[in-house]
Amino acid sequence: MNQNLILRIVGVILCIEALCMIPPLLLSVFGGGVDQRAFLYALLICGGVGVLLSLIRADNARLQTRDGFVCVALCWIALSVFGALPYFFSGSCSFIDAIFETVSGLTTTGASIFPSPASLPRGIQFWRALTQWMGGMGILVLMLALLPKLSEGSVNLMKAESPGPISTKLRPRTGETARILYRIYIALTVAEALLLRIAGLPLFDAITTALTTISTGGFSIRDASIAYYQSHLVNWILIFFMFAASVNFTLLYLCVTRRFREALKSEELRVYSLVVVGASAMIATDLIVRTGRDIGSAIENAAFQVTTLISTTGYCTEDFDLWPQFCRCILVLVMFFGGCAGSTAGGVKASRIVLLCKSLRRDLRRVMHSREVRPITLDGHRVTEETVSSVSVFFFAYIAIMLLGTLILSLDNIDFTAAFTASLTAISNVGPGLGAVGPTCNFGFLSGISKLTMSAIMLLGRLEIMPLLVLLMPSVWRRK
């Protein structure tokens, strides 16, 4: 294992995180916030450790696949620990709570321990939003965009951090691909912030909401989330950008370069769009029939909640935990389904669901026709058996971790619905669940063990399980 290079990369990542603490520090200084010292101390500690680690000399600049997984896992753990310092030093919460809030931010989950985000200092509010934006595209991708020559095995870093079963490179060089992804990411963020400002949101609200929408994070500076604004225009703007952020960024790049036909050929996009429209239609119909809602309100709220949960953003325009049981069941299913591979969304991912369904269909055909050889394809390209197998393993691990999390959370003596949806929302990086962890509640009541458990599950979900699990394998740490 290339330990020196891994530690050096961790140091560079911590330096980037320290630089990201400057905007909330300045906001606090010029706004007269009480959290000035918190950010100053956190910046000095994070930056100091980062500089020391980044000075480590690495004779070998090559990262193998194993090194890539270990590096990504250690970087995210370090980011979570040092990113928690502003919360802790500000006196807003305990260190375990600070870890939970930071992990929830970086993994774009959006579950919070704060009962009233609106009462937090401006610096902390902005830090919450910024951590989600940092984690949405991936801070290692940002590092590759800024410092593409830091490691010769940068493709292994990108593979380990990027979501989805099949990785797509937009350019031959990993650094070029990272820069294209971040240009799209920044452009979407700026466009949404401008539209929200035009729609009537205060500038600070527009910026923080844009940061947490494009990252599909869901943190809001308002206690009532998006319901606070009571604006149909804001709701539809958010629906559009939540959907865009949950689509494979490769397809967005094709649209930017006017290759619309190529983008529309995506099987995953067609399935994902069908699920969003279908789930919204079913919920809207049920709301109209069972609750007597008018058609406009039913369609808007159904579309918003389906899009926010399937994209794993986690905003709310109303308490969907009070909706009919059929609606709640559909919302739980879309939380599990998640967005598209190669997006900022969490969940199982539409491409994996498509591959699992095709694998099931092929195996059923083999029962009837044992000699038939039928390869699985996606977008007209043959999918290797190794990829199909990895999707099945991922799905099993996903379910197992979710059930284990439910079991551990039940030790807090909360009901099954709350424990199950809390575990689901953690591994899918959604945010709100049902019952005691519903959209109008927070996670502050959980015990320290449960908060650390959820933090681990959130990291497993964001890194798609394997990078963290490989840390538990003794063979990873043996020198070869």
Describe each region flagged by the PLM.
Residues 1-480:
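Membrane-proximal intracellular helices of multi-pass ion channels
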